[in-house]
From Swiss-Prot:
This is Putative 12-oxophytodienoate reductase 9. Residues 339-412 are annotated as: Disordered. Keywords: Fatty acid biosynthesis, Fatty acid metabolism, Flavoprotein, FMN, Lipid biosynthesis, Lipid metabolism, NADP, Oxidoreductase, Oxylipin biosynthesis. SUPFAM superfamilies: FMN-linked oxidoreductases. Belongs to the NADH:flavin oxidoreductase/NADH oxidase family. Transmembrane segments: none annotated. The lineage of its organism: Eukaryota, Viridiplantae, Streptophyta, Embryophyta, Tracheophyta. Putative oxophytodienoate reductase that may be involved in the biosynthesis or metabolism of oxylipin signaling molecules. It comes from the Eukaryota. It comes from Oryza sativa subsp. japonica. Its EC number is 1.3.1.-. FMN binds at residues 25-27, 58, 177, 294, 379-380. One of its GO terms (biological process) is oxylipin biosynthetic process. Pfam families: Oxidored_FMN.
């Protein structure tokens, strides 16, 4: 490729990036029992290149953040009461897994072991007992937020460490996205700013969500603080606060979802309060120069229409600038109301801190986006092809269909 801005160095705060292609967080729900697994090490190490920035998949700030009920979250198990596959870890340091050789590469047998591990996991979801043998397709269940990784206890910190070390060994920088699910997943009692879910139930929320009390909101903010602290203990270079895609912080922003009449509802400032509090707490805990924030103000995920998305975004960007947050990760909307298409720009729009944009599927399109000085993120491309950065260098990226599937080391 001729001289491209995508491959030019970029200084982001105290971080020196070799190029402007960032590995976006992609939820995979393969961390059985919320414990990072051996295949996570291989997955991220494959995608790490010198001077690159990777952002790990959304990691829950608490057991309740997975979408569990308040009572269950208080003393709930870290994993479901079903047998785990051989090699999956519950409170065991990942370095004990004998298929990892030097923490970065794996032998051919090790790769196959990891692939078999993942295959076992998916097969175990085909029946109710959790046994891979004799699975019946009729009992298939979709990946669950319960299988998202977490960052709320010491065991998870220890499980993340070798994964972070593997990424650092490749010369890359590694952030972790921290997240609270809210009402999105199908669970017993998801939490929400509101009382009901549009007056009925559907496949997204089979039970009525539980309204959060003020004290519980304060605790959630504290959970974000602790998760950020734990991420640094695990070796991450920073965290990204997930305030997008219809999850809890995003739910508070949307007037169609947030019907509260207290200090967390009503005005734009009130609806953004929990997000602002979380940003402030995390910045205070680990330093604002280690904090990014993900927003999707125009997206209407999970029936969460917004009447004032631009006002919400501008308010939050102003707060980020005041705190000195490292970057703002804005997602290109794929779910949006028709009237928001081509929405006019605010005449005095404040510039977001170090803008990062996700949802730019082709490197030529991304090249146009990063010329003003931001970075482009690619999550889905890297999910399928860990070498996407190397492909751009010669200017001959493979077509989207040419990806490695069964058999190769990329299948994790």
């Amino acid at each position: 490729m001729e001289d491209t801005h995508l491959l030019t160095p970029y200084k982001m705060g105290q971080l020196n990036l070799a190029h402007r292609i960032v590995h976006a967080p992609v939820s995979r729900f393969r961390s059985y029992g919320s414990m990072p697994q051996p295949h996570n090490l291989l997955y991220y190490a494959q995608r790490a290149t010198p001077g690159a920035l990777l952002i790990a998949e959304a990691s829950a700030v608490s057991y309740a953040a997975l979408g569990r009920s308040k009572d269950d979250a208080a003393n709930g198990p870290i994993h479901r009461q079903r047998p785990g596959p051989p090699g999956f870890l519950f409170g065991t340091n990942l370095t004990d897994y004998n298929s990892a050789t030097d923490g970065v590469k794996a032998t051919e047998s090790g790769v196959n072991d990891r692939n078999n591990l993942s295959k076992w996991w998916f097969m175990s979801r085909l029946n109710e007992s959790g046994n891979a043998g004799g699975a019946e397709e009729s009992h298939y269940t979709l990946p669950s937020s319960l299988d998202a990784p977490g960052l709320w206890n010491q065991e998870q910190i220890e499980a993340w460490r070798p994964i972070v070390d593997a990424v650092h060994a490749k010369g890359a920088l590694f952030f972790c996205q921290i997240w609270h699910n809210g009402r999105v997943f199908s669970t017993d009692n998801p939490v929400t700013p509101q009382v009901s879910y549009f007056g009925n139930t559907d496949d997204l929320a089979p039970a009525a969500p539980q309204r959060l009390e003020t004290g519980e909101i304060v605790q959630i903010v504290e959970d974000f603080r602790v998760a950020a602290r734990n991420a640094i203990k695990a070796g991450f270079d920073g965290v990204e606060i997930h305030a997008a895609n219809g999850h809890l912080l995003h739910q508070f922003m949307k007037a169609s979802v947030n019907d509260r009449t207290d200090e967390y509802g009503g005005s734009v400032e009130n609806r953004c309060r929990i997000t602002v509090d979380a940003m402030s707490a995390v910045a205070e805990e680990i330093g604002a120069d280690r904090v990014g924030v993900r927003l999707s103000p125009f997206a209407d995920h999970c029936r969460e229409e917004g009447t004032d998305p631009e006002e919400v975004a501008l308010h939050l960007i102003g707060v980020m600038n005041g705190l000195g947050v490292l970057y703002c990760h804005v997602i290109e909307p794929r779910c949006m109301r028709e009237q928001h298409r081509g929405a006019p720009r605010a005449p005095q729009r404040p510039a977001p801190p170090a803008p990062v944009q996700k949802g730019v599927p082709r490197h030529v399109h991304c090249e146009r986006r990063v010329r003003p000085g931001g970075r482009g993120q690619g999550g889905r491309r890297r999910l399928r092809r860990p070498g996407v950065v190397r492909e751009i260098v010669p200017g001959q990226p493979r077509p989207a269909g040419e990806v490695q599937a069964e058999g190769g080391s990329e299948r994790v």
